[in-house]
Structure formats: structure tokens, C-alpha cells
């Protein structure tokens, strides 16, 4: 059984969010939550929110045991960029990209599924 949770249009660049995603991929659910709780990165707070949602989905929808869950997949995809302009000298303007990303976290129980 694999359960997913998504956060779309998160206001952080995908490059920065992937640094945190690489740390929690493959860990147990409780261990991943503890790691994210003490991280001082902005992406860690967003990732913790999505991970807690995935754990709650597994518990409520599938009746899964929290102690058996592990983080099976963490994907961080680029979202659309908002464009802002910064005024420069002589009437010129530079473009500023406010990047977004989509964070997907999947948790699964430790047991191997037989099809």
C-alpha cells in the first residue's frame, strides 16, 4: 500500500527543496518527521507539512500503522514562475523570477505487496 500527499505551488525553488527531499527519502516516517522538525531550512517546514498529511492519509484511508510506514518516494518538480520587475537606471528593468515547486511525498508500509 502506497499513499501520497501533494503540495502544489510552494513558494520555494525546486533546487532548494530538493536538498531537504534527499535527506528524508527512504527513512522511516517518524524518523523523517524528527529530522525535519530540527532542520532550519524553509523547505523542511513545507516538507514536514506534506509528510504529516501523507501519514494521516495512510492512517485514515488505509488503516495503516504509523510505526510501519516509511517514506518511499519524494519528488520535487518545478512549478510556474511568477515574474516581477526591478527598476534599474535609465528607464530599464530587470526581471526577477519568483520560483515555485510541487512537492509530492509517498509513504508505504514495510511489507512487500504481492500482485
UniProtKB/Swiss-Prot annotation:
GO cellular component, one term: cytosolic large ribosomal subunit
Record GO terms (molecular function): rRNA binding; structural constituent of ribosome
InterPro entries xref list: Ribosomal_uL22, Ribosomal_uL22_bac/chlpt-type, Ribosomal_uL22_bac/org-type, Ribosomal_uL22_CS, Ribosomal_uL22_sf
CDD domains: Ribosomal_L22
Single GO biological process annotation from the record: translation
SUPFAM superfamilies: Ribosomal protein L22
Keyword presence, RNA-binding: yes
Keywords of the record: Ribonucleoprotein, Ribosomal protein, RNA-binding, rRNA-binding
Function: This protein binds specifically to 23S rRNA; its binding is stimulated by other ribosomal proteins, e.g. L4, L17, and L20. It is important during the early stages of 50S assembly. It makes multiple contacts with different domains of the 23S rRNA in the assembled 50S subunit and ribosome.
Self-association and partners: Part of the 50S ribosomal subunit.
HAMAP family reported in the protein's UniProt record: Ribosomal_uL22_B
Family: Belongs to the universal ribosomal protein uL22 family.
Protein's recorded name: Large ribosomal subunit protein uL22
Species annotation: Coxiella burnetii (strain CbuK_Q154) (Coxiella burnetii (strain Q154))
